[in-house]
């Protein structure tokens, strides 16, 4: 599978996705990488440590107490960072978003992959936007309520939908 200008083998190899949250309220690193220069230094460090893809996210999706952003607010966070990373490094860029408008803006800015934590279930335009772009996507499982009877069966059923 081609992501950006790199070929990724889909069998028998593990890849490392480094996370660059440009949010003030991320549960893991809130606010650390909002500054462009600090963020680029962090990307440089992650590349040196073996990162294969950088995943840029502009809205916290922690399990509790995060702020939902408008498309415009999220775009204002991620697009400048996508452009800065693209201009400074030869590394595939993943955009972590579940909103089609943000995905469109990120694709125009140079994102190479869309990482949708809602597995195309939040925004009914997302599949169309990704398909039209020709980019690969990473689909994840998520639920608003963690009401699992049999976790593995429930996750498999959700992903099959």
Name the predicted role of every residue range.
Residues 20, 46, 50, 96, ...:
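Conserved, mostly hydrophobic/aromatic
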Residues 41-57:
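Catalytic domains of carbohydrate-active enzymes, especially glycoside hydrolases
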Residues 20-21, 93-101, 119-120:
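Glycine-rich beta-to-alpha transition loops that act as phosphate-gripper elements at the mouths
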Residues 1-24:
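N-terminal amphipathic alpha-helix/helix-capping segment at the start of soluble metabolic enzymes
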Residues 11-16, 51-52, 87-91, 110-112, ...:
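Short, well-ordered coil/turn segments that N-cap beta-strands
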Residues 65-95, 104, 128-138, 142, ...:
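Alpha-helix-loop-beta-strand connector modules within alpha/beta enzyme cores
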Residues 24-26, 61-65, 109, 117-161:
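Conserved anion-binding
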């Amino acid at each position: 599978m081609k992501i950006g200008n790199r070929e990724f083998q889909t069998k028998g190899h593990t890849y490392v996705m480094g996370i660059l949250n440009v949010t003030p309220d991320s549960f893991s690193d809130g606010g650390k990488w909002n500054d462009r220069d600090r963020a680029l230094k962090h990307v440089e460090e992650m590349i040196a440590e073996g990162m294969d893809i950088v995943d840029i996210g502009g809205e916290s999706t922690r399990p509790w107490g995060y702020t939902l952003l408008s498309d415009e607010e999220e775009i204002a966070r991620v697009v400048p960072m996508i452009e800065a990373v693209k201009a400074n490094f030869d590394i595939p860029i993943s955009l972590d978003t579940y909103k089609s408008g943000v995905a469109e803006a990120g694709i125009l800015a140079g994102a190479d992959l869309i990482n949708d934590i809602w597995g195309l279930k939040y925004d009914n335009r997302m599949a169309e936007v990704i398909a039209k772009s020709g980019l690969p996507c990473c689909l994840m499982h998520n639920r608003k309520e963690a009401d699992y009877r049999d976790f593995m069966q429930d996750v498999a059923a959700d992903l099959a939908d």
